[in-house]
UniProtKB/Swiss-Prot annotation:
Localization of this protein: Cell membrane
Highest taxon in the source lineage: Bacteria
CDD domains: ABC_KpsT_Wzt
Keyword NAD: no
Disulphide connectivity of cysteines: none
Protein's organism: Staphylococcus epidermidis (strain ATCC 35984 / DSM 28319 / BCRC 17069 / CCUG 31568 / BM 3577 / RP62A)
Parts of the chain that traverse the membrane: none
Role played: Part of the ABC transporter complex TagGH involved in teichoic acids export. Responsible for energy coupling to the transport system.
Molecular function in Gene Ontology: ABC-type teichoic acid transporter activity; ATP binding; ATP hydrolysis activity
The protein, known as: Teichoic acids export ATP-binding protein TagH
Enzyme class (EC, first level): translocase
Bilayer topology term: Peripheral membrane protein
PROSITE patterns with a match to the protein in the record: ABC_TRANSPORTER_1 (PS00211), ABC_TRANSPORTER_2 (PS50893), TAGH (PS51251)
Domain spans labelled ABC transporter: 24-243
């Protein structure tokens, strides 16, 4: 299978400032030291055509940062990411403007993707029908629930038929009927040998849908490989983690976060 996405030593860091004074000092003094937070640290993996990669990890591990970088909405601090094909990101609010109506968002987002108005007009009825939003499609998106936003975003991105699809928790909201319809559509993409990155806390969906697993912990790639090799390790970790008290879970998260801060 051909390589669709290649990620080499991908790192995303954020300078942490306590106040505006620290921010100004950092801008004026090149060697000024401040805390740096590593959202992602030296992540490398390769995805091939037909791969369905589940990005798993507890909240705050760096899954969404990685998915946004694959989608192109976040630039890396260092490292490289090479994409062979068009990418669409399906997240609850990805690329939606709250001031615009559903129809206007469809037009705007597809224009940004490079579609011509004639093509948009042709695809518009299909997108609206798939979204199941009815008359709400003519209302401003700021009035939408999270489930309605997810429906609109999914309908746009799935209809444009991308080569690489990134799904970030978009199936965690909304009604079960629509979720199943989305899963059926995703299975069509899987059968067509598209590359899919699937961010989810739903282990059942991950097990049924994915072929490979990338386990992110504390901004680092802890494990990456075939589903049957990595998922049992992650499930064992989750079982142990969930047995901890809330205080112990908090302590575990705090230790992970502390390891991601560096003064430089």
């Amino acid at each position: 299978m051909s390589v669709s996405v290649n990620i080499e030593n991908l790192t995303k860091e954020y300078r942490i400032y306590r106040n505006n004074k620290d921010r100004i000092k950092d801008a004026l003094i090149p060697k000024n030291k401040n805390k740096t937070f590593y959202a992602l640290d030296n992540v490398s993996l390769t995805a091939h055509e037909g791969d369905v990669i589940g990005l798993v990890g507890i909240n705050g591990s760096g899954k969404s940062t990685l998915s946004n970088m694959i989608g192109g909405s976040i630039s890396p601090s260092s490292g490289e990411i090479t994409r062979h094909g068009d990418v669409s990101v399906i997240a609850i609010n990805a690329g939606l403007n709250g001031q615009l109506t559903g129809v206007e968002n469809i037009e705007f987002k597809m224009l940004c993707m490079g579609f011509k108005r004639k093509e948009i007009k042709k695809l518009m009825p299909e997108i609206i029908e798939f979204s199941e939003l009815g008359e709400f499609i003519y209302q401003p998106v700021k009035k939408y629930s999270s489930g309605m936003r997810a429906k609109l975003g999914f309908s746009i991105n799935i209809t444009v038929n991308p080569d690489i699809l990134v799904i970030d928790e978009a199936l965690s909201v909304g009604d079960q009927t629509f979720t199943q319809k989305c899963l059926d559509k995703i299975y069509e993409f899987k059968a067509a040998k598209k590359t899919i990155f699937f961010v989810s806390h739903n282990i059942r969906q991950v097990r049924e849908f994915c072929t490979k697993i990338a386990w992110i912990e504390g901004g680092k790639l802890k494990e990456f490989g075939e589903l049957e090799e990595v998922l049992p390790d992650y499930e064992a970790f989750l079982k142990t983690f969930k047995k901890k008290s809330k205080a112990e879970q908090k302590e575990f998260r705090n230790k992970l976060d502390e390891s991601r801060f560096v003064v430089k």
